[in-house]
Amino acid sequence: MKHDPQFRALTPKWHQGYRFQYEPAQKAHVVLYPEGMIKLNDSAALIGGLIDGKRTITAIIHELQQQFPNVPELGMDVDEFMEGTKKKNWIDLV
């Protein structure tokens, strides 16, 4: 699935009340929210760590492609993460 440039031009930011951080007790990155905590896998943590309310989806993909140049599906993975977290209201896309 490929997205048009308009989708990738959006800037993700964590939804109000949601916070991304490393949780030593879980030995993992998590998303904290008022009702609890979501433990992220390594891929989601890499993407989530780049959500700062300033970078566009395109910029996040570019940053990850610099770190992982031999992962051709990386853009699709980021798109799916953004779509999924938006549907769950973890992030806002502006």
From Swiss-Prot:
Molecular functions (GO terms): quinone binding
Keywords associated with the record: PQQ biosynthesis
Family matches, as InterPro entries: PQQD (IPR008792), PqqD_bac (IPR022479), PqqD_sf (IPR041881)
Pfam families (UniProt xref): PqqD
Keyword check for Heme: no
The protein's annotated pathway: Cofactor biosynthesis; pyrroloquinoline quinone biosynthesis
GO aspect biological process, one term: pyrroloquinoline quinone biosynthetic process
Family: Belongs to the PqqD family.
Function comment: Functions as a PqqA binding protein and presents PqqA to PqqE, in the pyrroloquinoline quinone (PQQ) biosynthetic pathway.
Subunit annotation: Monomer. Interacts with PqqE.
HAMAP family, sorted: PQQ_syn_PqqD
Protein known as: PqqA binding protein
Organism annotation: Pseudomonas savastanoi pv. phaseolicola (strain 1448A / Race 6)
